[in-house]
């Protein structure tokens, strides 16, 4: 007898580089698993955040060696990190669009390779321009491909513990800074700046296996096929939603003041009379308060005691007020002083700023639906980058005009307070705050992705995406 012919089903494998979850042998969950492999994704996002933002913050240790080798000013070498940060933030929507089209896993893996090549290319630089191209453009674009897709994938794995998971991932920045800063100094002392950049390229390549851990997850309401139009993949249609537009405007204003302490907190402490070690302590306690608050606020937000939009407005306002206090602290002593008042103000600022950070990304699924989280994350990072590029230079200009950083921190705090005031309008922009209306589809078909009450979104997540409309 002739052997029976096998019938091959069409669509057994995706056009992507990896099988889609529909083809997996195990059944898919009806909603986010809220744990399980999601914690592996959280650990991967933690490492991705550390190997991008944490490494970027530590690069400044190599700038004195670069300035001496190329006989350039400190301002010229500072443009390396400024360019890398600008490219990383501004190109984040590109990473989101590619992730929406091809999946987060291959995009993050490619981003890790590009970032690593940027360091390797820079290790052979014969001019500072080569460092601008290698670290600023190539590595910066590689980092742009990793952060938003990783954070968006993480948000899809969690519902009740989403903000806690996001807060855990965001602590990778501070944790890696504590480890990479002394490690980079050791590499510079041992191998010089060229050898250090080569080894940093090898370390950065670990972004690729981290990306391999971002397994795709199909949720109810996901569109049957990814968008083919570049504009649709960028998610610009999200700005047609009133709630997201309000959130975007507030976040852009907050970005104008949020990054100023990253650049000018230590110089401000020196202006207030502290020595180098005292200024370093001020920065350190602010960073530790920031990291701890991200976890605590993530847990608090997931308890559901206070709606996320209200928490976002409250902690945003506290961050702005904290910067006011930091700016108004008087002269605290000489170089031997530890600066008690400024130290206390820095702790208060760090706690409030750290509490704000996970809420920015944790509130997105409630505004755009789980299906639009990756696109929304890229757009939010781009908006914050616009404010981040304007805030520190304006702060430095005010310092030059007034002689200290008081006006700079007052303006930064005012920008954050303005953005937080705009956040107050978020609950009224959500559908459930208007007249009650029946859901478009029966509740069993939507999946319990977020705590009730919920509303069905038709795009970008498709029918069945959920919206946290708690006011």
From Swiss-Prot:
Tissue note: Expressed in liver, salivary gland and thyroid.
Organism: Homo sapiens (Human)
Reactions accelerated catalytically: pyruvate(out) + H(+)(out) = pyruvate(in) + H(+)(in)
Family note: Belongs to the major facilitator superfamily. Monocarboxylate porter (TC 2.A.1.13) family.
Protein name as it appears in the record: Monocarboxylate transporter 11
InterPro entries recorded: MFS, MFS_dom, MFS_trans_sf, Proton-linked_MCT
Membrane topology per record: Multi-pass membrane protein
Complex formation: Interacts with isoform 2 of BSG.
Pfam family, one: MFS_1
This protein's record includes keyword Iron: no
Segments for region (Disordered): 1-31
GO molecular function, one term: symporter activity
Cytoplasmic side: 1-35, 428-471
Biased composition (Basic residues): 1-13
One Gene Ontology biological process: lipid metabolic process
Subcellular location: Endoplasmic reticulum membrane; Cell membrane
Main function: Proton-linked monocarboxylate transporter. It catalyzes the transport of pyruvate across the plasma membrane. Probably involved in hepatic lipid metabolism: overexpression results in an increase of triacylglycerol(TAG) levels, small increases in intracellular diacylglycerols and decreases in lysophosphatidylcholine, cholesterol ester and sphingomyelin lipids.
Effect listed in the UniProt record for changing residue 113 to I: Risk factor for T2D
Organism lineage: Eukaryota, Metazoa, Chordata, Craniata, Vertebrata
Reported disease: Type 2 diabetes mellitus: A multifactorial disorder of glucose homeostasis caused by a lack of sensitivity to insulin. Affected individuals usually have an obese body habitus and manifestations of a metabolic syndrome characterized by diabetes, insulin resistance, hypertension and hypertriglyceridemia. The disease results in long-term complications that affect the eyes, kidneys, nerves, and blood vessels.
Feature: compositional bias, Low complexity: 19-28
Gene Ontology CC: endoplasmic reticulum membrane; plasma membrane
Membrane-crossing segments per the record: 36-56, 78-98, 106-126, 131-151, 163-183, 198-218, 243-263, 273-293, 312-332, 333-353, 367-389, 407-427
Keywords, in A-Z order: Cell membrane, Diabetes mellitus, Endoplasmic reticulum, Lipid metabolism, Membrane, Symport, Transmembrane, Transmembrane helix, Transport
């Amino acid at each position: 007898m002739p052997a029976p012919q096998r019938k091959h089903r069409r669509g057994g494998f995706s056009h992507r580089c990896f099988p889609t979850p529909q083809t997996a042998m195990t059944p898919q969950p009806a909603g986010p698993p809220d744990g399980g492999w999601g914690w592996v994704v959280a650990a991967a996002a933690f490492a991705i955040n550390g190997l991008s933002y944490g490494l970027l913050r530590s690069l400044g240790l190599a700038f004195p060696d670069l300035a001496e080798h190329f006989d350039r000013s400190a301002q010229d070498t500072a443009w390396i990190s400024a360019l890398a940060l600008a490219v990383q933030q501004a190109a984040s929507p590109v990473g989101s669009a590619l992730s929406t089209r091809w999946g987060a896993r291959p995009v993050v893996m490619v981003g890790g390779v590009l970032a690593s090549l940027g360091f390797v290319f820079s290790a052979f630089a014969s001019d500072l321009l080569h460092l601008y191209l290698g670290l600023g453009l190539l590595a910066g674009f590689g980092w742009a491909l990793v952060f938003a897709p990783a954070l968006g994938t993480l948000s899809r794995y969690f519902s009740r513990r989403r903000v806690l998971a996001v807060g855990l991932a965001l602590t990778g920045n501070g944790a890696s800074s504590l480890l990479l800063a002394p490690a980079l100094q050791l590499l510079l002392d041992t191998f010089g700046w060229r050898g250090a950049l080569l080894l940093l390229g090898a370390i950065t390549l670990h972004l690729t296996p981290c990306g391999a851990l971002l397994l795709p997850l199909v949720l109810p309401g996901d569109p049957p096929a990814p968008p083919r139009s570049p504009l649709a993949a960028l998610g610009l249609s999200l700005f047609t939603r009133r709630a997201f537009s309000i959130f975007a405007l507030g976040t852009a204003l907050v970005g104008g003041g949020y990054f100023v302490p990253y650049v000018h907190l230590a110089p401000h402490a020196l202006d207030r009379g502290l020595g180098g070690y005292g200024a370093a302590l001020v920065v350190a306690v602010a960073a530790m308060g920031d990291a701890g608050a991200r976890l605590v606020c993530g847990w608090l937000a997931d308890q559901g005691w206070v709606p996320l939009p209200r928490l976002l407005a409250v902690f945003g306002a506290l961050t702005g007020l904290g910067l006011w206090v930091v700016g108004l602290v008087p002269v605290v002593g000489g170089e031997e002083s530890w600066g008690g008042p400024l130290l206390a103000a820095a702790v208060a600022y760090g706690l409030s700023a750290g509490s704000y950070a996970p809420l920015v990304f944790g509130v997105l699924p409630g505004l755009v639906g789980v299906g639009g989280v990756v696109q929304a994350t890229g757009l939010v990072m781009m908006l914050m980058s616009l404010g981040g590029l304007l805030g520190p230079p304006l702060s430095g200009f005010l310092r030059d005009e007034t002689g200290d950083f008081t006006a700079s921190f007052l303006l930064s705090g005012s920008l954050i307070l303005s953005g937080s005031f705009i956040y107050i309008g978020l609950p009224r922009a959500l559908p459930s705050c208007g007249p009650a209306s029946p859901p478009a589809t029966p509740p069993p078909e939507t999946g319990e992705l977020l705590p009730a009450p919920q509303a069905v979104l038709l795009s970008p997540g498709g029918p069945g995406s959920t919206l946290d409309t708690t006011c």
